[in-house]
Regions:
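Extreme N-terminal starter segment of soluble prokaryotic enzymes
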Residues: 1-4
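Short N-terminal binding/cap micro-motifs at the start of the first secondary-structure element
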Residues: 11-17
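An N-terminal, globular interaction/scaffold subdomain
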Residues: 18-114
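Well-ordered, non-membrane alpha-helical segments in soluble/globular domains
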Residues: 22-25, 112-120, 179, 183-186, ...
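Extended, Lys/Arg-enriched charged tracts that mediate electrostatic binding to polyanionic substrates
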Residues: 106-134, 190-201, 205-206
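Glycine-rich, mobile lid/loop segments that gate access to catalytic sites or pores
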Residues: 130, 136-152, 187
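Loop-centered beta-sheet repeat module
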Residues: 147-218
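C-terminal structured domains
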Residues: 223-354
Length: 354
């Protein structure tokens, strides 16, 4: 039996003298890092890696990420084949020094009734674009009336970086940039956002469009158990005809499994070190420790860990036979992080435009 863990955010994006995991008890993770075979690949967008895992060839072209993410939304019906979609996620724009930056909203910050009012206003004002809808307070969609002839950057690429470097590109770039400006005016003046600002809360004063593409059939993946909470990964799995359930280590140990653990992704993107440390300590207890024990007992034949991040992707492979190689010493995560080059913040580095 083999398990493949995908853990975006495990590689802390910033380089610092004091390691981000300093003081954490990560005995099992250090054992896995020391016992296994490690390699490090250059940066590749997370969505491209997920697509390849689900059977999409490298030359599959622009993937319909919005349609796939929407397919993975438990609260919404599957999008019809041939429909065009964009993710239209609410964000907050603010100035930091001379740059306009954006930040996203956690799932519990925007109230459902406020979201409903904002969505209704957008549909009243921008009906020519298509139809807006919200799956959750922080995940919105636009079903396009006509295809978008532009390239968009995923939201996670733009978080915390100058917005001007991640604006739409391509044939209709100016149209979409103008549309975003018009949306910002409507959202800024909306009573919901006026009330939020008056109360000292962040306004949802813009939308971030990404994931353009037509909903279409996907390649069939090799049958295996897939565990994921992330709606994009759920969409990839469902499109490939796979069953997908929430991550659970005990169930993963019952059969060959592909597991996406995105607990560390948002804290790493936002450089939220406290949340990252708390969640990493939990992963040590709920995943790394039981998987290390399963390797030692030979209940698990092999474990692969892929950790995509801005600094590249760590690939780790540990076999049950490696457990008895006593000369291999544990490798603390902070020691590994110090050996990895800093991330390149340029938009060219984030070449997975969608």
């Amino acid at each position: 039996m083999q398990i493949h863990l995908v853990v975006p955010g495990l590689i802390w994006p910033a380089v610092s003298a004091l390691g981000p995991a300093s003081g954490l008890e990560l005995t099992s993770l250090a054992w896995l890092l020391g016992q296994g075979k490690r390699s490090f690949a250059p940066f590749e967008p997370l969505d491209a890696q997920l697509a390849r895992l689900m059977g999409y060839p490298d030359d599959a072209g622009t993937l319909p990420l919005a349609a796939l993410r929407r397919l993975g939304e438990p609260a919404l019906p599957a999008p019809a084949v041939g429909t065009e979609w964009l993710c239209a996620d609410p964000v907050c724009l603010s100035f930091a020094r001379e740059h306009l930056l954006l930040s996203e909203f956690p799932a519990d910050e925007l109230q459902p009734e406020d979201v409903a009012a904002l969505i209704a206003s957008l549909n009243d004002t921008f009906g020519d674009l298509g139809t807006f809808a919200a799956a959750t307070p922080n995940r919105w969609y636009l079903r396009l009336a006509t295809p978008a002839r532009a390239r968009f950057f995923p939201l996670h690429d733009a978080v915390g970086r100058p917005v001007r470097d991640f604006l739409p590109e391509g044939e209709d770039a100016r149209l979409w940039q103008r549309t975003m400006n018009e949306l910002q005016v409507v959202l800024h003046n909306h009573p919901v956002n006026q009330a939020r600002e008056a109360a000292g809360h962040r306004p949802a004063n813009s939308l971030w469009f990404w994931g353009a593409g037509e909903s279409r059939p996907a390649p069939q993946s090799a049958a295996r158990a897939i565990q994921a909470d992330d709606p994009l990964m759920r969409g990839f799995a469902l499109a490939a005809g796979c069953t997908v359930v929430a991550p659970d280590c005990a169930k993963a140990l019952e059969s060959d499994s592909l597991v996406v653990l995105d607990d560390l992704l948002l804290p790493a993107l936002h450089l939220d070190i406290d949340s990252w440390r708390t969640r990493l300590a939990k992963l040590e207890h709920t995943w790394f420790a039981p998987l290390a024990a399963a390797l030692r007992s030979k209940r698990l034949r092999g474990l692969k860990i892929s950790a995509p991040g801005d600094r590249g992707t760590l690939e780790l492979e540990v076999r049950a036979a490696d457990a008895w190689k006593f000369w291999r010493k544990p490798l603390p995560l902070d020691t590994l992080l110090k050996s990895i080059a800093p991330a390149d913040a340029s938009p060219q580095h984030h070449s997975g435009t969608r």
